[in-house]
């Protein structure tokens, strides 16, 4: 995983199962929520191997007979005031054709106080998944880190967006020329997803986050565009705390 700067983090989501889309009178906010709901309605998927049997958005980019590969990704990014930015997360590639999964756990640190050639460091630990269990494929001597990897849970396994249509008064942005779009909503600390994140991560702030839904490409679906979701707790030049998650169906190699 490559977290270079705050604005360059792209966690991808594909538009999932098809259904009735928007009507001409739908607002852009409604269209954005419906576009994301096609994938987010699948949350939670407790057993990730269920994705082998789940369809996603496919277009001409997929070869005939290719069922596609699900890309699952979650990461927590924390930058305390005056310190370096650290990202810890995992990405899996779940091939629906071969029903096999590989990926890696990543720890990345970015320290803008250092010289350019020393500013960024990243360590990747390759993994595979069998019977819904994450298994490191190389020896890890650090037992604490090994357990962190083996017990890692993706947001898609416990998050829920069943009430996304009820989110209101979002900060909406839409550029038809690109096209790019986003919707940002203020959440409370008693929000289900916020509570679940706080259970699993040591989030060093009591501030309630904002939920950001952001994407590019055709709102009705595109395999070349992107969609990302983020829970942004703090975002400024000196301090950043946010969580990113993605679920994307891409053509298999």
UniProtKB/Swiss-Prot annotation:
<dbReference type="GO" id="GO:0005886">
    <property type="term" value="C:plasma membrane"/>
</dbReference>
<dbReference type="Pfam" id="PF04507">
    <property type="entry name" value="DUF576"/>
</dbReference>
<keyword id="KW-0449">Lipoprotein</keyword>
<feature type="lipid moiety-binding region" description="N-palmitoyl cysteine">
    <location>
        <position position="17"/>
    </location>
</feature>
<keyword id="KW-1003">Cell membrane</keyword>
<protein>
    <recommendedName>
        <fullName>Uncharacterized lipoprotein SA0399</fullName>
    </recommendedName>
</protein>
<keyword id="KW-0732">Signal</keyword>
<keyword id="KW-0564">Palmitate</keyword>
<dbReference type="InterPro" id="IPR007595">
    <property type="entry name" value="Csa"/>
</dbReference>
<keyword id="KW-0472">Membrane</keyword>
<feature type="lipid moiety-binding region" description="S-diacylglycerol cysteine">
    <location>
        <position position="17"/>
    </location>
</feature>
<comment type="similarity">
    <text>Belongs to the staphylococcal tandem lipoprotein family.</text>
</comment>
<feature type="signal peptide">
    <location>
        <begin position="1"/>
        <end position="16"/>
    </location>
</feature>
<dbReference type="InterPro" id="IPR038641">
    <property type="entry name" value="Csa_sf"/>
</dbReference>
